[in-house]
Amino acid sequence: MESKEPSPNLEIRPVRPSDRAAIWAIFESVIRAGDTYALPRDMGEAPAMAYWLKSGHEVHVAETQGRVVGTYILRENPAGGGADIANCGYMTAQGSEGRGVGRAMCMHSMERARARGFRAMQYNFVASTNDRAVRLWQQ
């Protein structure tokens, strides 16, 4: 399926405490599927939110018409001397795939990474079967 341009009403903004339930709903459906993240499929809400909303992570949500349809984290790459390399993780809500949400979050995260002084972006753990993500990251 070809990715469509995001809705003109799509807003990407910093996370708010009130977004927690929406982020958990997205996170839970993504990890339960088990085909995009190297995280335990049975991970509970508390450890999942501790992982995603961890201090040092810059967290954003994609919202359209008052509904959170995606979320991403931006952080220093955790590997060794890679503090000048950014790492991101993205999750899109079920039913919002193929609508440009992931692409919009990717472009936003690249802008944020540049603004923070990162020199490059590294994507860790992109499953080869995640066709949409692989195509996006290859562009």
Region locations from a protein language model:
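Short acidic N-proximal helix/loop "leader" segments that mark the beginning
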Residues: M1-P6
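A short beta-loop-alpha structural element at the N-terminal edge
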Residues: L10-I23
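Acetyl-CoA-dependent GNAT
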Residues: P14-P17, T36-G95, C106-H108, R112, ...
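Hydrophobic pocket/interface hotspot
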Residues: I23, F27, A48
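Conserved acetyl-CoA-binding loop-helix of GNAT-fold acetyltransferases
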Residues: G98-A113, V134-Q139
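Conserved GNAT acetyl-CoA-binding A-motif
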Residues: A113-V126, R135
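Short, polar/acidic, helix-capping and beta-turn segments at strand->helix junctions
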Residues: N130
